[in-house]
Amino acid sequence: MTLAASPARERVVRPKRPRHLSEAMRCETAFRLILSECLEEVATNHEALSSGDPAALHQTRIALTRLKAAIAFYGPMVADSEWTRLKSELKWLSAYLGATRDLDVAIENSKGLPEERMLMTARTDAFEALREALQSDRYWQWFDGMWDWVGSGPWTTRQDPRAAQRRAVPVSVFHARRLAQWHGKLCHKSRGLQGMGKNKRHRVRLASKRLRYAIEFSEGGLPADVYASWRNVLKHLRKGQQLLGELNDDEVRRKLFESADALDQGADEGKARHQRVHERKRKSQLLRRAAAIYRKIAE
């Protein structure tokens, strides 16, 4: 499918919003501030991303993950039919971003190795597809649609008393309750981490990211002493996320090599066997360290 290219267009310069929330702020105001910051980050990185900058790609993916975390955090308060449509479009965009980012990570971990050239070629192809997507009308319709939804989507005008009440709840009340819920769910999901399969482990990693970002954008919205306790959880979450991320990167890299037949096991079975032993040992070490971190998160 060929994507229609969007002509050069003059983007609206949007004012910078305050970074932090306040305890008395209404939830609907806080939600708009958080989502606006995420979208501004996407816009800031767009030009560099379209030029192939790996750092801009990474920052764009973080901004979009934060955006999805915020929408999940506010949940029924903001979910509506328009978000369902926009979420589907975001999934389309994320597929291009993810394919290119996976190759960036694999290349970084393969410097000087024989497979580096193969990965560079695959990265060029993946980026061309990403750039075409970023220049398409479909992308800009999604991006402008997100701004419209944040400012005046169906969620903003629901008239039933419960919806209006939810939107008006102070940040300090809602965030304290919601963070506790998410923390409890993560503690439950992370039990038995060392014996988990990759799918369950992936869900722990996603839940970790969401809780991490939720804590980060709660700064200012909770009393200082309450936020201090979450800051300690945040420190462990970052470390746990790093370890699970390394495991994920290893698995992605292995899949890339397998799909491209990078390892000729018939010709060099000894080398392949040595590589598998090394991978199992590294995986065991990372899982052991991650399990210790998640026990601290649950304390």
PLM regions and their residue ranges:
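Function-determining surface determinants
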Residues: 1-299
